[in-house]
């Protein structure tokens, strides 16, 4: 790792090294170029920044705390563990940070309709929330499989006035929902704004979503200075598409003393075909408008991803993560379904916080590492979302485990 400036990307073509870019239909190219121009103009506009700050403070509820997880720290008997509490945001996850930014951009561009894809439903809820706040019609594409396992979030979206379109193609998960949203966008380019929920898609989306989420890392930096008088030693976040992770990581990328770890969904194990670990089990390819690491078969076809967590169940990863993996600035590991569930239960019992199953992957890795570290090592875990949405999944898993145990006795 010889490079010292890891925060300069993307270049004018939307590339982070060899990853990213704009791989879109000809009909969409003028739209993404226009979006890029509008975003660059908004970034330079003090009024846009002022409006963002207002909604982040008074609507989202920022800044959220950097919380010392005292009992988890005692349990691990090693590193001092802090939680960046994104689950305390309005709507219960980090997703709203990005949605506020993009809806303000949509309004600035005069768009009259919002569309979005969602997996776990949290981005769908956040999109439906901002659509209601700004009086815009909203269509959410969601895989039929995810609709089944995320009924509570589906109902929340409907309460907020969104139209839910079930996607039955493929495995009926996030990849398929994104495919359908892109088809809608191509058909309705003039009046529709596609509010992508992660650091993927054609340029400028990966950079734009990262920038809107970077408030996570900026606050963490300030709060850690206030609490400990120095930078953290390590950062840990779960990675699906990777927006919560990029939001935490990006402000620290050029701080060489800070170790950064992204945690992919290992499913049943990366040595099986039931996982969603694109960096640990994939190869470079093109999907959803950008070049990145993808789960593919020998013929280059996208394979199905698996995770107990609907929000990590995606066969790709944001292109900036792919770049950071290749230049070895960030270490990417994987955590299995079972390890995530164990960490989920430990967090509930030790800290009185019910985390999302996505977040539980990061917690599992944090607990593994903390045990082997000195007590002056400062570790920050991004608590990306709360676990209300995962109650049924956890209940089903516990019931299945009990049945298996009964058979063994």
Curated annotation (Swiss-Prot):
GO terms, molecular function: tryptophan synthase activity
InterPro entries listed in its UniProt record: Trp_synth_b_CS, Trp_synth_beta, Trp_synth_beta/beta-like, TrpB-like_PALP, TrpB-like_PALP_sf
Residues with PTM N6-(pyridoxal phosphate)lysine: 95
Pfam families: PALP
Stretch forming the signal peptide: none
Pathway stated in the Swiss-Prot or TrEMBL entry: Amino-acid biosynthesis; L-tryptophan biosynthesis; L-tryptophan from chorismate: step 5/5
Cofactor: pyridoxal 5'-phosphate
Alphabetic keyword roster: Amino-acid biosynthesis, Aromatic amino acid biosynthesis, Lyase, Pyridoxal phosphate, Tryptophan biosynthesis
Enzyme Commission code: 4.2.1.20
Family from the record: Belongs to the TrpB family.
Function: The beta subunit is responsible for the synthesis of L-tryptophan from indole and L-serine.
Quaternary structure note: Tetramer of two alpha and two beta chains.
Protein name: Tryptophan synthase beta chain
Species this protein is from: Pseudomonas savastanoi pv. phaseolicola (strain 1448A / Race 6)
Source organism phylogeny: Bacteria, Pseudomonadati, Pseudomonadota, Gammaproteobacteria, Pseudomonadales
């Amino acid at each position: 790792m010889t490079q010292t400036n890891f925060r300069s990307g993307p270049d004018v073509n939307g590339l982070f090294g060899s990853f990213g870019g704009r791989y879109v239909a000809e009909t969409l190219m003028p739209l993404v170029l226009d979006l890029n121009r509008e975003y660059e103009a908004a970034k330079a506009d003090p009024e846009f920044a002022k409006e963002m700050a207002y909604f982040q403070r008074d609507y989202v509820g920022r800044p959220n705390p950097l919380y010392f997880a005292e009992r988890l720290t005692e349990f691990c008997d090693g590193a001092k563990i802090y939680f960046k509490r994104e689950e305390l945001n309005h709507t219960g996850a980090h997703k709203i940070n990005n949605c506020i930014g993009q809806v303000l951009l949509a309004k600035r561009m005069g768009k009259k309709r919002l569309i979005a894809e969602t997996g776990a439903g949290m981005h769908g809820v956040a999109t439906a929330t901002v659509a209601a706040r700004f009086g815009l019609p909203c269509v959410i594409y969601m895989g039929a499989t995810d609709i089944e396992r995320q009924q509570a979030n589906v109902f929340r979206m409907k309460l907020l006035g969104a139209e839910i379109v079930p996607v039955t193609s493929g495995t009926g998960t996030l990849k398929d929902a994104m495919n359908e949203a892109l088809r809608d966008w191509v058909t309705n380019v003039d009046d529709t704004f596609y509010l992508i929920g992660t650091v993927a898609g054609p340029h400028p989306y990966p950079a734009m979503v990262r920038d809107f989420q970077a408030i996570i890392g900026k606050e963490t930096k300030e709060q850690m200075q206030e609490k400990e008088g120095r930078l953290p030693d390590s950062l840990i976040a779960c990675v699906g598409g990777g927006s919560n992770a990029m939001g935490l990581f990006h402000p620290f990328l050029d701080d060489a003393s800070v170790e950064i770890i992204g945690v992919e969904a290992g499913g049943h194990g990366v040595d099986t075909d039931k996982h969603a670990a694109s960096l640990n089990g994939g190869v470079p390819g093109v999907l959803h408008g950008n070049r990145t690491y993808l789960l593919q078969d020998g013929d280059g076809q996208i394979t199905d991803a698996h995770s107990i967590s609907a929000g990590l169940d995606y066969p790709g990863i944001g292109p900036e993560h792919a770049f950071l993996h290749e230049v070895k600035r960030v270490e990417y590991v994987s955590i299995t379904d079972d390890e995530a569930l164990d960490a989920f239960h430990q967090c509930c019992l030790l800290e009185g916080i019910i985390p999302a199953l996505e977040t539980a992957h990061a917690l599992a890795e944090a607990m593994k590492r903390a045990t082997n570290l000195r007590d002056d090592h400062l570790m920050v875990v991004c608590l990306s979302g709360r676990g209300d949405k995962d109650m049924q999944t956890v209940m089903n898993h516990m019931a299945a485990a009990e049945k298996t145990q009964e058979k063994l006795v």
